[in-house]
C-alpha cells in the first residue's frame, strides 16, 4: 500500500525523500511514499490557516455532524483498519481492535467534554449579562507516536476540530499508514478542504512544521523531545503546547500476599502489555523485603514465562508482539545489559521469531542506583524495601510523574499512597496502564506540562473569552468618581 500527503483537500505526492514502513514481525513492506519537504509543510499550514475562519464560524452542530460521520466510518472500517495497524505496529489484533473502538468512542466523549469544560455559560448582571465563551486557537500541529498511532493523535485531532481549530498532522515515521487511514476517514466524513492536512516524514518534517506559523503543538512522545519543544518555543508564548510525555512509573505491592497469582496478573498487565511500549507501563516494582515480596516476585516470573509472544496474525493469539523495530529491540537489550542488578528474567530474543521480538525481562536492583529514564520495552526493575514509607520514597524517586499504582488490601495504605504519590494517574488494585477517555490523562515533572489529554483535551483546544454585555448604551456618568463640576 502506498500513499502521500493530504493538503487543502487533495492527495498529492511529497517532494522529499522516500519513506516506508514495515511489519516489525516479518520485515515486509507495509507503506511507502515520498516525505514532505519544507515547502510541502508550508503549503499544509497555509491551507489550514486559510480554512480556519470558515471552520471556526461553522455552526457547532455542523462540526459535530462531520465528526459523527467520521465515527461511523471508523466503525464500518474497523476490521481492515485494525489489521493495517497490526501490520504496521506488530500489535496483536485484540489490541488494535480495542484501539479502533477507542477512536470511535472519542467523538461522543469529546462532545460531552466540550460542553462541560468549554461551552457557553451566562449569568445575569445589573447592567445586562456576563457570558463565558470559548474560541478556537487556530492552526494546531499534531505530532503522533507509534505505539497508539490512531488513538493518541485522534485524541488531539477530534477535540481540536470540534472546537473549531484546523489541523496539520504528522504521524510517526514508523506508522505513516495509520495516519493516512485516519485522514482518509475524515475526508470521507466531509471535512472541508484545509481543515485537516497530512504531512509525512521524520524529524526534518516535524522541524519544518513547528517552524511554521502555528497556534498550537499537540504532542505525544518522549521526555527528551518534550524538553526540546519547551526550549524551542520559549520565545513564542503565543503557541500553546500540550505535551504528553513518558514515565518511569512505580507499582508498589504491600500487604497483598494472600493472592500472589492475582497480584502477578496486575503486575504483568502493568509492565508487559503492548510489549512495554505504553508510556504508562510500570517500569519499577517495589515490594516488601520479606517472604511475601519473594512470593510476589516468584508468581510474577512464573506468569511472565507463560505469556504467548508472536506475530499479530499468529494462530495462537499472542499477549506480546514485537517491538516497533529490530533497532528498538537491539537498543533495549543494550540498556538492559548495562542495568546494574541481578537478572531474574533476561530480556532475550525469541527463538524462531524476528529480531524485533523480546521476552519479558525482570531485574532485581535492590540497594542500587539506576538511571531515571524510561525504557520503552518489556523490562521491569524490582526493588525490595523494608517499610511502606520507604516504598513511597522509592516510588517518588523519579523526575517523571505520569502513572503509579498500589496493590494492597488495606484502604489505609491506599489513602496514604494517594496523598503522597506524585503522578497524574494513580490506581489502586488496577494496572498502571488503566485509563479512560472519560477522565484526564497526563503527568507531572518530565511527564508533561500540566495540560492533560483525554477528557481534558478540550481545555487546550480552545481559550476562554469573558464578555460583559449590555444590549444598549446605558448612562454610566454617575459611576465616574472624582469629576469636576
Swiss-Prot record:
Keyword Cell membrane part of the UniProt annotation: no
Superkingdom: Bacteria
Active site as annotated: 244, 279
EC number: 1.2.1.71
GO biological process: arginine catabolic process to glutamate; arginine catabolic process to succinate
Keywords, in A-Z order: Arginine metabolism, NAD, Oxidoreductase
GO molecular function: succinylglutamate-semialdehyde dehydrogenase activity
Residues the record lists as binding NAD(+): 221-226
InterPro entries: Ald_DH/histidinol_DH, Ald_DH_C, Ald_DH_CS_CYS, Ald_DH_CS_GLU, Ald_DH_N, Aldehyde_DH_dom, SuccinylGlu_semiald_DH_AstD
SUPFAM superfamilies named among the record's database cross-references: ALDH-like
UniProt enzyme class: oxidoreductase
Annotated family: Belongs to the aldehyde dehydrogenase family. AstD subfamily.
Free-text function comment from the UniProt entry: Catalyzes the NAD-dependent reduction of succinylglutamate semialdehyde into succinylglutamate.
NCBIfam families recorded: arg_catab_astD, PRK09457.1
Protein name: N-succinylglutamate 5-semialdehyde dehydrogenase 2
UniProt source species: Caulobacter vibrioides (strain ATCC 19089 / CIP 103742 / CB 15) (Caulobacter crescentus)
Amino acid at each position: 500500500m502506498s500513499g502521500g500527503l493530504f493538503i487543502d483537500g487533495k492527495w498529492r505526492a511529497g517532494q522529499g525523500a522516500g519513506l516506508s514502513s514495515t511489519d516489525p514481525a516479518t520485515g515486509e513492506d507495509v507503506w511507502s511514499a515520498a516525505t514532505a519537504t519544507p515547502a510541502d509543510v508550508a503549503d499544509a499550514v497555509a491551507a489550514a490557516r486559510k480554512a480556519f475562519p470558515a471552520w471556526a464560524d461553522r455552526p457547532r452542530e455542523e462540526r459535530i455532524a462531520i465528526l459523527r460521520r467520521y465515527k461511523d466510518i471508523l466503525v464500518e472500517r474497523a476490521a481492515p483498519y485494525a489489521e493495517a495497524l497490526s501490520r504496521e505496529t506488530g500489535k496483536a489484533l485484540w489490541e488494535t481492535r480495542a484501539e479502533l473502538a477507542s477512536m470511535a468512542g472519542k467523538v461522543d466523549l469529546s462532545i460531552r467534554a466540550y460542553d462541560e469544560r468549554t461551552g457557553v455559560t451566562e449569568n445575569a448582571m445589573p447592567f445586562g449579562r456576563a457570558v463565558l465563551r470559548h474560541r478556537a486557537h487556530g492552526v494546531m500541529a499534531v505530532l503522533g507516536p507509534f505505539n497508539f498511532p490512531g488513538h493518541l493523535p485522534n485524541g488531539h485531532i477530534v477535540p481540536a476540530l470540534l472546537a473549531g481549530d484546523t489541523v496539520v498532522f504528522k504521524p510517526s515515521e514508523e506508522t505513516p499508514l495509520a495516519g493516512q487511514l485516519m485522514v482518509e476517514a475524515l475526508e470521507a466524513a466531509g471535512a472541508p478542504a484545509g481543515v485537516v492536512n497530512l504531512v509525512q516524514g521524520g524529524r526534518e518534517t516535524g522541524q519544518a512544521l513547528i517552524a511554521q506559523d502555528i497556534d498550537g503543538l499537540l504532542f505525544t512522545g518522549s521526555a527528551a523531545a518534550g524538553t526540546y519543544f519547551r526550549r524551542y518555543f520559549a520565545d513564542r508564548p503565543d503557541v500553546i503546547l500540550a505535551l504528553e510525555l513518558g514515565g518511569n512509573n512505580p507499582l508498589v505491592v504491600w500487604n497483598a500476599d494472600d493472592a500472589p497469582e492475582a497480584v502477578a496478573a496486575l503486575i504483568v498487565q502493568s509492565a508487559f502489555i503492548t510489549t512495554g511500549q505504553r508510556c504508562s507501563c510500570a517500569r519499577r516494582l517495589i515490594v516488601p523485603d520479606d517472604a511475601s515480596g519473594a512470593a510476589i516476585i516468584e508468581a510474577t516470573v512464573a506468569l511472565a514465562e507463560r505469556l504467548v509472544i508472536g506475530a499479530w496474525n499468529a494462530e495462537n493469539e499472542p499477549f506480546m508482539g514485537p517491538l516497533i523495530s529490530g533497532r528498538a529491540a537491539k537498543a533495549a537489550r543494550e540498556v538492559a545489559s548495562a542495568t546494574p542488578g541481578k537478572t531474574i528474567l533476561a530480556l532475550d530474543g525469541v527463538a524462531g521469531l524476528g529480531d524485533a521480538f523480546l521476552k519479558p525481562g525482570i531485574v532485581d536492583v535492590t540497594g542500587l542506583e539506576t538511571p531515571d529514564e524510561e525504557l520503552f520495552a518489556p523490562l521491569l526493575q524490582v526493588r525490595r524495601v523494608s517499610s511502606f514509607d520507604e516504598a513511597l520514597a522509592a516510588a517518588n524517586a523519579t523526575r517523571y510523574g505520569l502513572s503509579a499504582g498500589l496493590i494492597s488490601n488495606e484502604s489505609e495504605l491506599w489513602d496514604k499512597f494517594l496523598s503522597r504519590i506524585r503522578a497524574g494517574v494513580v490506581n489502586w488494585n488496577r494496572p498502571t496502564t488503566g485509563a479512560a477517555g472519560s477522565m484526564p490523562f497526563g503527568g507531572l515533572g518530565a511527564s508533561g506540562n500540566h495540560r492533560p489529554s483525554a477528557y481534558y483535551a478540550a481545555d487546550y483546544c480552545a481559550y476562554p473569552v469573558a464578555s460583559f454585555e449590555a444590549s444598549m448604551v446605558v448612562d454610566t456618568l454617575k459611576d465616574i468618581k472624582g469629576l469636576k463640576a
